[in-house]
Amino acid sequence: NQLADGSWGDAGTFSIFDRILNTLACVVALRSWNIHPHKTDKGIWFMKKNMCRIDEENLEHMPIGFEVALPSLIDIAKKLEIDIPTQTRGLQEIYARREIKLKKIPRDIMHQVPTTLLHSLEGMAGLKWEKLLKLQSEDGSFLFSPSSTAFALQQTRDHNCLKYLTNHIHKFNGGVPNVYPVDLFEHLWAVDRLQRLGLSRYFEPEIEECIAYVHRQWTEKGICWARNSQVEDIDDTAMGFRLLRLHGYEVSADVFRHFKSDGGEFFCFKGQSTQAVTGMYNLYRASQLMFPGENILVDAARFSANFLQLKRAKNDLLDKWIITKDLPGEVGYALDVPWYASLPRVETRFYLDQYGGDDDVWIGKTLYRMPYVNNNKYLELAKLDYNNCQALHQQEWQNILKWYRSCSLGEFGMTERSLLQTYYVAAASVFEPEKSQERLAWAKTAILMETITSHFEFQQLSRDQKRAFITEFEHDSILKYTNGGRYKRRSSLVGTLVRTLNHLSLDILLAHGRDIHQPLKNAWCKWLNSWEEGGDAELLVRTLNLMSGGGRRRRWASEELLSSNPKHEQLLKATIGVCDKLRLFLRRKVQGGNGCMNATGMTTVEIESEMRELVKLVVTRSSSEDLDSEIKQNFLTIARSFYYAAYCNQGTINFHIAKVLFEK
């Protein structure tokens, strides 16, 4: 495995930290065994030539425990009379960092309770092994580190250490990873990548299995990268918390109290030397799933957002755990578009540019790859899927445009720009090809609501004229054809509304044998009679639920059955309430009022509070008679679309429209 330049390490990515550490370890091993002297000499030559480059490397990319492991290896090399330069400025910095780290976790503490130093024992002198062996993991390792465990075996001849190493040497055909297992980390990050790439719908059983596996390992103190760990970290805990909560599992936000110092700072590990960008990034993402009253998540959101904003302002968004294609882009999107406002297709379109596939490299004790998390197959499939959806959306948009023109909706005040934005919001929220009926029903419903509102307001219709419009719709909803099929109506806008509802109802009747015409008409009658009071969200939710039936578990539950469910009424009330406030907020913003937002995603305190309550209603499972998750998600989907319109300025929305619908 020696590379052409005499070094050992990751062949695909050059990191001087990785190459020096691996090369010195291999040279020490070969010299100890007194074999392959020519390879040893090539390795020494590489180190003599490149040791001075340590001070050129970005310290954020220093491998885990490097500041402890390298000095220990150098001490061993000196005993073996291996001639390598040790007086470089970069090495002096490494030694200084070692002292800082060892002071953060004193020797007496590391012998009493599990700490991250268990992961980096190799070469440390003066250890009390009889005490450390009591901190051994269940699998025989020292915090799942083969190298740390190998050093322990060398010092103690412990049978469990030998068993751990032997099992993994056989498993990996003579070698071992830098850390193993990584089962929780792998399960969580694979799910996260599939979701952000827009592929999760293809792997729902596998994802449910992954999430259930993580839930079985969950503890009130959190988790780390592997099961049965006595040490927890905020990165895996935050990702686990977020995904478990999204999938309906009950997890307490109090878990994050274990990662908060007395001074109010959040940390990944106790005694850490530096703060990881991705750890704070995932804490920030987790905090956006907060429920009412979860003050620890309010603190977490504030701390992580401030940390990330400061890093971004300094152009310092480098991470100590991963070298990825566009981490600044990922963090920037999260800060600029909070989760409430993040429409699924928008997130996926940006992430397709940010995801590095095979080229993303993780930083552990050495550089390593996570093929189930980062691979080109995911990226290739995601791009194919996105392009397929985009092509369908573009065709639907052309059909919407034809419908708009044939119905002369422009004469009633509906502009083509508003038409495009309305369709885009529906398509970016409900994007799947198989949900075309729901998407088009949403788009046409929203378009007609805006058109009718514009007609009523800007034509300055009298109360009697509005009443006549509503009466005509209420009493004339059965299609009548005369003169060779030409549709007759006193009001062409009423005619368009009636035809649209009949068309939507007929689609469902033909596809699923379900007649939704009457409940759809009832929903419109309710909106028309109270349009000045809002009610847009209620009409959209009812339309979406009627078009999608009762969800996957209870396909085509009746409107009466849905409405009789107490959870349905709670969701409807919460959605209407927050959407009405968002509509008012948007109107004030457009009119130059006092609506304001800050970088943590705030609109108003009241709106944020009500969004948290809605999220809680949607993601929690109340009982076996709970609504289907797809139906519950419809409420949140509509609310998030309102939040998006209120949060993003018009320039941002226009940019998103171009990128999501039209950019290849």
Curated annotation (Swiss-Prot):
Q: Where is this motif: DXDD motif?
A: 233-236
Spell out the InterPro entries in the cross-references: Isoprenoid_synthase_dom_sf, Terpene_synth_N, Terpene_synth_N_sf, Terpene_synthase-like, Terpenoid_cyclase/PrenylTrfase
Q: Which domain of life is it from?
A: Eukaryota
Q: Which GO terms describe its biological process?
A: gibberellin biosynthetic process; miltiradiene biosynthetic process; terpenoid biosynthetic process
Pathway listed for it?
Secondary metabolite biosynthesis; terpenoid biosynthesis
Q: Name one GO molecular function term.
A: ent-copalyl diphosphate synthase activity
What does this chain do? Involved in the biosynthesis of ent-kaurene diterpenoids natural products such as oridonin, miltiradiene, eriocalyxin B and nezukol, known to exhibit antitumor, anti-inflammatory and antibacterial activities. Catalyzes the conversion of (2E,6E,10E)-geranylgeranyl diphosphate (GGPP) to ent-copalyl diphosphate (ent-CPP).
The free-text domain remark for this protein reads: The Asp-Xaa-Asp-Asp (DXDD) motif is important for the catalytic activity, presumably through binding to Mg(2+).
Q: What else is on record for this protein?
A: Abietane diterpenoids (e.g. miltiradiene, abietatriene and ferruginol) accumulate specifically in the periderm of roots. The ent-kaurene diterpenoid oridonin, main constituent of Isodon rubescens, accumulates in leaves.
Task: Give the protein name, as stated in the record.
Answer: Ent-copalyl diphosphate synthase 5
What organism is listed for this UniProt entry?
Isodon rubescens (Rabdosia rubescens)
